[in-house]
């Protein structure tokens, strides 16, 4: 699948225009995108990064990393996904960067999602749904998620997000209405961010292959 990831990432470079500030996500597919972006780094103003991991890789390529508070809205955001449904709704957060990813997606005019074919699903939920939670609310949120969804929340032990929070992964879901579930989970006190990108789905999904498919 690494070749499919690389092909999807390189296709996303087609959407990068001269003088842009590019929003950059996190994960193994995005790493290929950052490497490809490095070849045209002289053409862009810089990048806004969703994680310390991506920031380090961008800087290795000599790309300036900028603060979203100083850039205003972005023209383009490129990120991967753990699952993608036919409506371009996504599960994200396997790398625990979901909150910053969602912030950058919201600030961007266009969200390009790059995936390998294994990430395409008819219904979201086989991949456990990440939920970023304030540490003191972990047990409370887990109980409320169980009551609300019937899914099984599991604490991702040992993982602390770049924001200093913890992650619950919710197993055994079949998400037939992602927008409604995203809204409901966001109402639970202590929830920082839900790894459903449904209210703001991807605008374009690029599926790696020979040739890549654009959805």
Curated annotation (Swiss-Prot):
Keywords: Isomerase. Substrate binds at residues 26-29, 79-82, 92-95, 119. GO terms for biological process: D-ribose metabolic process; pentose-phosphate shunt, non-oxidative branch. It catalyses: aldehydo-D-ribose 5-phosphate = D-ribulose 5-phosphate. Homodimer. InterPro entries: NagB/RpiA_transferase-like (IPR037171), Ribose5P_isomerase_typA_subgr (IPR020672), Ribose5P_isomerase_type_A (IPR004788). HAMAP family: Rib_5P_isom_A. It comes from Xanthomonas oryzae pv. oryzae (strain MAFF 311018). GO terms for molecular function: ribose-5-phosphate isomerase activity. Pathway: Carbohydrate degradation; pentose phosphate pathway; D-ribose 5-phosphate from D-ribulose 5-phosphate (non-oxidative stage): step 1/1. Its EC number is 5.3.1.6. Belongs to the ribose 5-phosphate isomerase family. This is Ribose-5-phosphate isomerase A. The active site is at residue 101. Catalyzes the reversible conversion of ribose-5-phosphate to ribulose 5-phosphate. One of its GO terms (cellular component) is cytosol.
């Amino acid at each position: 699948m690494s070749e499919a990831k690389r092909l999807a990432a390189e296709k996303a470079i087609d959407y990068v225009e001269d003088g842009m500030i590019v929003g950059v996500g996190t994960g193994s597919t995005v790493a290929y995108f950052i490497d490809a972006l490095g070849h045209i780094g002289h053409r862009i103003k810089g990048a806004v990064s969703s994680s310390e991991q991506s920031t380090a890789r961008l800087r290795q390529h000599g790309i300036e990393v900028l603060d979203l508070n100083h850039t205003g809205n972005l023209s383009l955001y490129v990120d991967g996904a753990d699952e993608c449904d036919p409506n371009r709704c996504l599960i994200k957060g396997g790398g625990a960067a979901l909150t910053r990813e969602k912030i950058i997606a919201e600030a961007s005019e266009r969200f390009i999602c790059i995936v390998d074919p294994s990430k395409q699903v008819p219904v979201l939920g086989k991949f456990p749904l990440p939920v970023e939670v304030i540490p003191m609310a972990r047990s409370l949120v887990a109980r409320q998620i169980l009551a609300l969804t019937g899914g099984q929340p599991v604490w991702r032990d040992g993982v602390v997000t770049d924001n200093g929070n913890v992650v619950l992964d919710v197993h055994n879901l079949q998400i037939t209405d992602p927008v409604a579930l995203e809204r409901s989970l966001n109402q639970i006190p202590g929830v920082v961010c839900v790894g459903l990108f449904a209210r703001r789905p991807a605008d374009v999904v690029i599926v790696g292959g020979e040739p890549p498919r654009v959805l």
